[in-house]
């Protein structure tokens, strides 16, 4: 899979975005995030300033208290992230998010299949295929579709 993504990044098809747009719709008809939740179990989102404001207000906490309780600052990337996994807001019995309505933008957009032009996110998909069945299916279907072009 990774080799395919690397080759695709180097030899771009002009129809890549059209093909991936159609595949994206198929993938979501076949995917149930609540049966998996690997993103919440194995990864951590980054928290934007807006995320911090929204979530801490929802929890009736100060931003400072929210950061101290659950987050760590990554000096290299400049991002606030969860201190540990699985996510503190994941209900492990139901795989549901306890702050779904106000979850971080990174979570709301994950796995970023149609976030930007496909070429701009191939490197992200390359990372996410190990965690996300939707990403894996997307890449698998893209591989088949590109052999037909």
Q: Where does each model-flagged region fall?
A:
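Short loop/turn segments that flank or connect secondary-structure elements
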Residues: 1-149
């Amino acid at each position: 899979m990774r080799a395919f993504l690397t080759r695709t990044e180097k030899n771009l098809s002009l129809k890549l975005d059209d093909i991936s747009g159609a595949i994206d719709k198929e993938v979501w008809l076949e995917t149930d995030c609540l049966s998996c939740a690997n993103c919440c179990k194995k990864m951590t989102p980054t928290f934007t300033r807006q995320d911090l404001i929204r979530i801490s207000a929802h929890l009736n906490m100060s931003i400072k208290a929210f950061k101290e309780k659950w987050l760590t600052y990554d000096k290299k990337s400049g991002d606030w992230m969860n201190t540990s996994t699985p996510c503190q807001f994941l209900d492990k019995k139901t795989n549901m998010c306890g702050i779904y309505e106000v979850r971080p933008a990174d979570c709301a957009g994950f796995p970023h299949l149609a976030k930007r032009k496909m070429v701009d996110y191939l490197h992200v998909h390359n990372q996410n295929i190990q965690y996300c069945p939707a990403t894996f299916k997307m890449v698998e279907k893209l591989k088949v579709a590109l052999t037909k072009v």
